[in-house]
């Protein structure tokens, strides 16, 4: 007789996205069992100002490891994502302790799948420090 499937634990998560359009950050609250999204909550969008967009554009197509200013841009980007998280928390009336995890991939600045190369900027550890929430 097959074992009954173990009930999955529900988690509240915040997902972050900053796409190649470089218009800004989208952040959304969701409920998940780790495999499926079972509910949605507050969502916010934070626009980038033109100066920051230009800084990101300056990294496109380059390996950020070879760019002296990439670290400062990555830190700025990460702090902007932390602000988006704080806005979602404010909109939802939740606190950091109520969130199980933040999904964060940074911002892709180099993507050549044919060569097996992709590079993102962003600092998950800094985001976790800034928000008090684990980051994956």
Each predicted region: which residue ranges?
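Short acidic/glycine-rich loops and adjacent helix/strand connectors
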Residues: 1-136
